[in-house]
Amino acid sequence: MKKNFVSEKYVSNRTMPINLDPDHDILFRNEYQKNIEKSYYFNLNNILIANNHLFKSRFFSLEPQYFKMDTENWNSTLISIKQIRDTFLKGNKPESIEKGSWVIDDKSFNFFHFMTDVLSRISMIENELEEYPILLPNSFKNKNYILEVLNLLQIPTVFYDENKKYYIKELLITSHAAPAGNYNKYFINRVKNQFITDQILDHKKSYPK
C-alpha cells in the first residue's frame, strides 16, 4: 500500500484564552500544543463497503481509523467474524462501483464534522475527484446543508444504499486531516478559501446589505 503524502507534519501552538480562569487551566493544558501528523491517501482494489465499514478480501476489516472517529473500543477481529457470518447467512450479492473516494467516518453526518473533517479530507484529493467521486450513504441526502455544500462546491458524488453491500473496484482512501477536534491548517484554510471565491460570493449578491 503506497501512501501519497499531501501535507507535512507540524506542531500547532494555541494561545491561551484571555478570559481563562487559572483554576481551569488543567482542563486545557493538553490542548495548547498538538502534533498534526502528515496527511495522505492511498488506493486499494476490490474493497467491500458494508454498514459503512470497509473490508478487504470480503471479510477482513480495514484499519478503523479510516472510517471511525473513535477507535478505542474497536475490535477488528469481532467485526470481521460478524461480516463472515452475515455474508453466509444473508448471502446478498454485492453491487459494483468502478471507482470512488472514501472521506467519511461514523460522525460525518454531523454538521460540525462534515464542514471541518469531511471537507478537509475532500480538499486533500481535490485533483482526484473527477476520476474518484466521493461515496456517501443515501442518509446524507436528508441533511440539506450537505446537499447544498456538494452543489455549491461542485463536488462529484456517488450515493449508495446503506442496506446493500458494494464492491469498489478501485477505492481512494484518505486519512483524517487531523485528530478529532483539531484541524490541519493547510486544508482547513483551503476549505475556507473555497467558500469565499467569486463563485460563492455571487450567491450573496441578492441579499440586502
Give each language-model segment a name:
Residues 1-209:
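The feature primarily captures lumenal catalytic ectodomains
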